[in-house]
Amino acid sequence: MGNALRFLYGHCCKPTVEDHYQPPHGYGVSTATVGVSALAHDLFHFENTSQIPEGLTKYVVSSKKAQTNWYKKLSQAWREAKPPPQTAEQATRLIILTLKRHQKADVKGLLRFYGLPLSNNPSTEATTVVAPPQADQGVKFELHTLPVDVKAVADGDTVTVYVNTEDPREASNLPKSVKVAAQERAKARAVRDYVKADALQKNIVDAGYRVLSGPNNEDILARKYRIRLRGIDSPESSMPFGKEAKEELIKLVVGKCLTVHIYEEDRYGRSVGDIYCNGQFIQEKMLKKGLAWHYTAYDKRPQLSKWEEKARAARVGLWASSNPEKPWEWRKNKRNGK
């Protein structure tokens, strides 16, 4: 992964766009730059997974094999750009120059997919989506994860993610002992000393890291984060709709790279954050599906209450019941032996 792509992705990838270019719910991004962020996100995702974005086929005429070829070229062009594109005009120019030998219909479709201008004299119509004052207050840092494993989803509001330690933030915080252990593990595996390799992996895991296999079977040293979705509370696994909530979160995040805004750490050591994936705000999706409550004891954002109210009115998910048990009351009763 090139540093230039990492920098822009980490710098400006806020909630992006859903299928693919729709203004993202007033979280402070502008239509002049959100397409650049979405493109950076998708190139980052492609380099980690070799997957092209969902929904692109509806905008272009060429096959998925051809689309994969475009993303290989665009990834290379982005890495080599100095500086990388930071405006819609610059992103448009990079796409047009990189794909100049390809069909015009495909190039135009790709630009439309990202909401980018179709010429190099754009953005006079760009408008800014006004963010609610509290939208990003208190964000301590931002994570860009590796693809999520199905076993990482604990329930409807908790997921374990891993972040590549080549990420600039992680690289600066990586303990030397963990880095050395990963290097020694690779050497042990190379000579088939799996006993030593497994022991080193255990040391790495105990330190909060893990060596994962990349898409080309390369080793990726990654840091582990347990994420508690901020502002929602889903039914516990043994409660009605607990299974459905977990399955919905699996459907939304598994196999995908996430952007996570971290606000704090809870008493269980989990990082409390907002999760975005492929242009979707995950808490919004869970609330609208009727698979979570707005956790008002810890979150006062009015938009989350509106999404819950919408699901209640439609009687979807757990709101099909006239009086569903609240998970925080269920947990309290369990603690009290009721």
From Swiss-Prot:
Domain (TNase-like): residue spans on this chain: 144-321
Active-site positions on this chain: R228, E236, R270
Keyword Hydrolase: yes
Molecular function per GO: endonuclease activity; nucleic acid binding
Keywords assigned by UniProt, alphabetized: Endonuclease, Hydrolase, Nuclease
GO annotations of cellular component type: cytoplasm
Keyword flag Transit peptide: no
Name of the protein in its database record: Uncharacterized 38.1 kDa protein
Organism whose genome encodes this protein: Capnoides sempervirens (Rock-harlequin)
Species lineage: Eukaryota, Viridiplantae, Streptophyta, Embryophyta, Tracheophyta
